[in-house]
């Protein structure tokens, strides 16, 4: 699950760079949404991993 979160975070960052750089102005809102979803998924997976007591697989 953490792997998916990292993947979506990277996609959101790339989309954000393209959108905020003026290359694709329409992707700004999509990048914001994907970025915040990735942050939420990362936080949830980190908390679940801490509660289970296992080390995260990075």
Curated annotation (Swiss-Prot):
<keyword id="KW-1003">Cell membrane</keyword>
<feature type="transmembrane region" description="Helical">
    <location>
        <begin position="4"/>
        <end position="24"/>
    </location>
</feature>
<keyword id="KW-0472">Membrane</keyword>
<dbReference type="Pfam" id="PF07043">
    <property type="entry name" value="DUF1328"/>
</dbReference>
<keyword id="KW-0812">Transmembrane</keyword>
<comment type="similarity">
    <text>Belongs to the UPF0391 family.</text>
</comment>
<feature type="transmembrane region" description="Helical">
    <location>
        <begin position="30"/>
        <end position="50"/>
    </location>
</feature>
<keyword id="KW-1133">Transmembrane helix</keyword>
<dbReference type="GO" id="GO:0005886">
    <property type="term" value="C:plasma membrane"/>
</dbReference>
<dbReference type="InterPro" id="IPR009760">
    <property type="entry name" value="DUF1328"/>
</dbReference>
<protein>
    <recommendedName>
        <fullName>UPF0391 membrane protein OCAR_5266/OCA5_c27040</fullName>
    </recommendedName>
</protein>
